[in-house]
Structures are given as structure tokens and as C-alpha cells.
Regions:
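Short acidic-aromatic linear motifs embedded in glycine-rich loops, typified by GG[WY][YF]DAGD(H)
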Residues: 1-94, 98, 102, 106-125, ...
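Aromatic-residue-lined binding/catalytic grooves and analogous aromatic/hydrophobic interfacial grooves
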Residues: 131-137, 141, 159-194
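Internal helical hairpin/lid segments
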Residues: 260-281, 290
């Protein structure tokens, strides 16, 4: 999941104003995306495509293994079946969501499809499939075998699944559904994350846009957009030299990332900004100003907002506080961002990555 999510966040961030190509890149994917010059024959998108397809395939394998376990009604088997159904469906749903958000047969416009299991599947259908997988994950995690398992935080797992459902609802502009889900998502002490301090591997975001960033870097535009101490604390950035003879050649990197730190999919900041947006949209009761300040004051109390936030202001805040998670692209696609970034987006030829050339051959 971590590699698939990280590579998706990087590609999506490069389609908007979060990321751009590195100063002296080895790989050309981010140059092709940021220059709006990527085609099916480019080939640079193939690794991400394969990564996401593999992520989905491995998730389905987990489901198949769970389904093949004997129906002997033992405690161990019941737990394995339930846990496999929960994990397999959760990740299958997220893999489909990432595929739909990253790739399309119509890169310049909505309404595209991707190739899945040798069939063309529309984005709309992929999102429906993802939603169904999340719902099935919820069914499995509510089985008695999991509730009875020692050491397993059943309630946290339920909140985790509902957070995935919530984010999908927001991306699809199903705001009434999101208003129901937001109370069921993670709390202030939780986050949906991929942990890297156990198996020896490194956080892939750190590897890509940490101090050794080469192929991709944070945009100067995003660096300059951090106008308060709170924003600079929330998104600390530094410059790393790439040419000892020329100090003006550097990459801008995310200095808060650590080699063994967690890769965050969603956290409390997501939830509070979603609540604020839903309140402003009139589908949730509450105080939008309180919600945004719960995020801001965590980083610097004196930077608390004093005016009731508009949707435009929420988009600006989300750009900083939820940076590098793929949310910026989703916000522009769903029309939350209405500024110059949205205008530039409309002018792009590549709003989704094109499918690799071989996937377009002999289409069904």
C-alpha cells in the first residue's frame, strides 16, 4: 500500500501546483507530467500503472485465500476468514480508487476508463466498486470472530474503514453521505498510516521528496504560499544543493519527512477540514471556524483564523495542511479550488495519466 499510495500522491501532486520535476532528475515521469507532455508511448507512467495493478491483484489474492479456507467453524479459521475479508476488501477498494484517480483513457477530460482484468471499466464504475469493497470490509470487521480477538482494536478498525469511505465520498462530491460518515471516522488521536519502522524499508515519500530528492521536488509556488508561522510549521521545507559549484541549483524538499516515519493517508486535519467544508456547504451543523482552528492552532496558536472561512479559504488551507496526499488534485477536480490553479488545470492536456501504450492495444 505504501509504495502505491506514495507514487500516486507524487504523480497527482505534479499535475497541480504541489510538485514539479527535480533540478537534475534521473527519471523523467515528473518532467513529463509537469510539462504536460506525457502520452501512452512515453512509458514513464508504466511503473505507477504496474504498481497500482499489482496492489489491486495482491488484495484480491488475500480475498481468494480467505475464501478458500475450510468452513470448519473453528475459532482460528473464523478469525482468519474475517480478517482476510476485512484487509483484502479495504485494500482492493483503495487500489481501485487510486487507479481511477491516476489513470484514464481520456486524460484531458472526465468520463474516462481504465483497463482492469482485460475489460474497460469506467471511473464511475471503479468508484462504485471501491465503495462496495469498503462496505464489505466493514461487514467482515464487524464479525464476531474479530470482535472476540484479543489485541485487535475493533472500534479503531471501523473508524479506519469509514475514513476511507468518507474521503471517497468527498472526492465524488457526495456531500450528504460525507456528512453522515464524518462522525464515524478517525478521532483526533488517530491517523490512517503505513508504518515503516518495523520491516527495514524506508518511507517512499521520504525517499522521493526528502533531503535526497532528485527526480521530483516541491514547487517554489507552494513554498511561497506558506504565509504564517503555523503554515511553515505544518509544512516545513528546505533547500538541498544538487550542484556544489552552483548554489542556486537546488531541490525544495519536505523536511518533516523521516526515513522510518509513517506515510500518512489521513489524519485529524483531514477530518476537521472536511467538517468545516460540510458546515459551509450547509449539510452539517457546527462551527466551521472552530474546526479550521483546531488544525491551525496545533502549529501556532496566534495564527488562529478570526473570520468565518469560505470554501475558497478552506481550499487554501487544505493546500498547505494536507499537502502531498493527493488531496490538492481531488480538490481542483471537484471544484473546491476556484483560483488560478483551477484555471491552469482546465488548460492542461494531462488531467489524468494516460494508460500505457500496451494497455490500449486490442481494447475490448
Amino acid at each position: 500500500q505504501g509504495e502505491a499510495a506514495a507514487q500516486s500522491f507524487l504523480a497527482l501532486g505534479t499535475t497541480v501546483d504541489e510538485l514539479t520535476e527535480g533540478t537534475i532528475p534521473n527519471a523523467l515521469l515528473y518532467r513529463h507530467i509537469s510539462s504536460d507532455n506525457i502520452t501512452p508511448s512515453s512509458g514513464t507512467q508504466n511503473d505507477l500503472w504496474n504498481r497500482l495493478q499489482n496492489y489491486y491483484a495482491r488484495s484480491i489474492e488475500v480475498l481468494n485465500v480467505a475464501n478458500e479456507l475450510p468452513d470448519n467453524n473453528t475459532k482460528a479459521t473464523n478469525l482468519s476468514k474475517a480478517y482476510g475479508g476485512y484487509i483484502g476488501n479495504l485494500h482492493a477498494g483503495y487500489a481501485l480508487q487510486l487507479l481511477a484517480e491516476c489513470f484514464s483513457t481520456t486524460p484531458a477530460a472526465e468520463g474516462g476508463s481504465i483497463r482492469l482484468n482485460n475489460a474497460l471499466v469506467s471511473h464511475e464504475s471503479l468508484f462504485t466498486m471501491a465503495q462496495n469493497h469498503f462496505n464489505k470490509a466493514l461487514e467482515f470487521v464487524q464479525m464476531q470472530a474479530i470482535k472476540d480477538a484479543s489485541g485487535f482494536n475493533y472500534n479503531a478498525a471501523v473508524r479506519q474503514i469509514n475514513t476511507y469511505k468518507l474521503r471517497l465520498a468527498m472526492h465524488q462530491q457526495r456531500y450528504s453521505d460525507a456528512a453522515t460518515l464524518v462522525a464515524l471516522a478517525i478521532n483526533d488521536s488517530e491517523q490512517v498510516e503505513v508504518i515503516y519502522n518495523n520491516d527495514g524499508s524506508d518511507n517512499p515519500l521520504y525517499a522521493a521528496i526528502g533531503p535526497n530528492a532528485r527526480d521530483v521536488q516541491v514547487t517554489a509556488n507552494l513554498e511561497a504560499a506558506r504565509s504564517t508561522t503555523a503554515e511553515q510549521n505544518a509544512l516545513p521545507l528546505k533547500h538541498a544543493s544538487v550542484d556544489k559549484k552552483n548554489p542556486n541549483r537546488y531541490n525544495i524538499y519536505a523536511s518533516a519527512l523521516s526515513r522510518k516515519g509513517a506515510l500518512v493517508i489521513a489524519d485529524a486535519a483531514d477530518i476537521h477540514f472536511i467538517k468545516a467544508e460540510l458546515i459551509v456547504r450547509g449539510v452539517l451543523s457546527g462551527d466551521a471556524l472552530v474546526e479550521v482552528n483546531k488544525v491551525i492552532t496545533k502549529y501556532n496558536a496566534s495564527d488562529a483564523e478570526t473570520a468565518m472561512p469560505s470554501l475558497e479559504r478552506i481550499a487554501t488551507l487544505r493546500r498547505i495542511y494536507l499537502a502531498l496526499r493527493g488531496e490538492r488534485t481531488a480538490d481542483i477536480r471537484r471544484g473546491l479550488e476556484q483560483g488560478s490553479a483551477a484555471t491552469k488545470w482546465q488548460q492542461r492536456k494531462t488531467k489524468w495519466l494516460p494508460l500505457p501504450e500496451q494497455e490500449l492495444e486490442n481494447l475490448p
